[in-house]
């Protein structure tokens, strides 16, 4: 991982959190429970009140539905929350989707690329130039896809 990578997100070679470094463990837990702070400190993102409410609702709820008009910042927020989840939950798989592949690539992943490129620190990982995929390690990844057939969504 690159220089400047947040110490709270560094992991040892055995893919296990180094529990001997308790302050970093506490810091990781802090960011897991504070997406608004993570977005501000690491991505430089300022949210408006409703976006903060949506972001914090992910802490306690498995499913969050957002009903809103066009242009309200849902895609902007979803992209940054995907990065928050990925980088605060090591060795996770973050799946992003939208109703069409065009929306995945041209909207959601465009926002992910912007947030990743403009992060205040080097987040690490390998953001593929054309594909909707950000790989941090072999089994630590964020990918985007869509399908017209619900059976394929597995």
What are these regions (language model features)?
Residues 1-154:
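Phosphate/NTP-binding elements of NTP-utilizing enzymes
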């Amino acid at each position: 991982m690159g220089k400047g990578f947040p110490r709270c997100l560094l992991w040892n070679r055995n893919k296990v959190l180094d529990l001997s470094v308790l302050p970093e463990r506490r810091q990781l837990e802090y960011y897991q429970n504070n997406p608004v702070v993570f977005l501000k400190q690491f991505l430089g993102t300022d949210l408006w009140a409703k976006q903060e409410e949506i972001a914090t609702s992910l802490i306690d709820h498995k499913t969050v539905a957002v009903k809103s008009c066009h242009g309200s910042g849902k895609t902007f927020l979803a992209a940054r929350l995907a990065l928050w989840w990925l980088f605060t939950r090591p060795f996770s798989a973050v799946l992003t989707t939208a109703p069409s592949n065009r929306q995945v690539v041209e909207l959601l992943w465009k926002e992910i690329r912007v947030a990743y490129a403009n992060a205040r620190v080097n987040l690490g990982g390998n953001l593929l130039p054309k594909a909707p995929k950000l790989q941090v390690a072999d089994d630590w990844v964020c990918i985007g896809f869509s399908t017209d057939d619900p059976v394929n969504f597995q």
